[in-house]
Amino acid sequence: VWLGDDLNKLILNSEGEYRHGDNRHNNEHDSATEEAELQLLYSRAITAYWNFQAGWRGDLQPTPERHWLALGLEGLAPWFIDVNATLFVGNEERTALRLGLEHELMFTQRLALVPEIELNVYGRNDLETATGAGLSDVTAGMRLHYEITREFAPYVGVHYWKQYGNTARFSRVDDEKTDGAEFVAGIHFWY
């Protein structure tokens, strides 16, 4: 959700994962909110295709909560690749970098396939959240969405995720999965 104009925007992003049944973190058959992230960002256009963003990110799940200062660039690279690169700085000298890339392949005016990839890199180990320094995880996938209106598009898709380095080691020690595939469904909307 955003409020503003093409030059200045206030953006509220939320992302979460709710799992039903077989749980990738502990192989139990339960249902729970696995991950919840909220971002409040100020976005300023710096060129016709690029925005500078600054604000706050809160990792609300898994516990303990982590709060970060966010600084990033979001825009459209050549060949219509959407890029989102954000540096996060948290307390106790925590740092993170997230890079996301996606490209919309239009089949019709309303139906599109969106391949995407996202990677997360952390500056130090965080034992409480089982996050390791270095390349932590990569998620790659595809979403198929249908725009009922330009502002409202349900989607289905599949994602493959894999943990690396110390993050994978922490997961193996806790007898958790370090990779897997999952089906996703949701609604993309804006107003």
Region roles according to the model:
Residues M142-E147, K177-Y191:
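Outer-membrane beta-barrel "beta-signal"
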Residues E65-D126:
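Detector for outer-membrane/organellar transmembrane beta-barrel domains
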Residues E15-Y18, D22-E28, G58, A70, ...:
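Extracellular loop and loop/strand-boundary signature of outer-membrane beta-barrel proteins
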Residues L12-G16, A54-G58, A85-V89, P115-V121, ...:
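Transmembrane beta-barrel strands of outer-membrane/channel proteins
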Residues A32-L38, E65-L69, E93-L97, G132-V138, ...:
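Residues that define the transmembrane beta-barrel architecture of outer-membrane proteins
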Residues L3-D5, R44, G75, V89, ...:
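Residue-level signature of outer-membrane beta-barrel architecture
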Residues W2-S31, L40, R44:
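Outer-membrane beta-barrel initiation region
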Residues L7-L12, A48-F52, W79-V83, T108-L113, ...:
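Repeated loop/turn-to-beta-strand initiation elements of outer-membrane beta-barrel proteins
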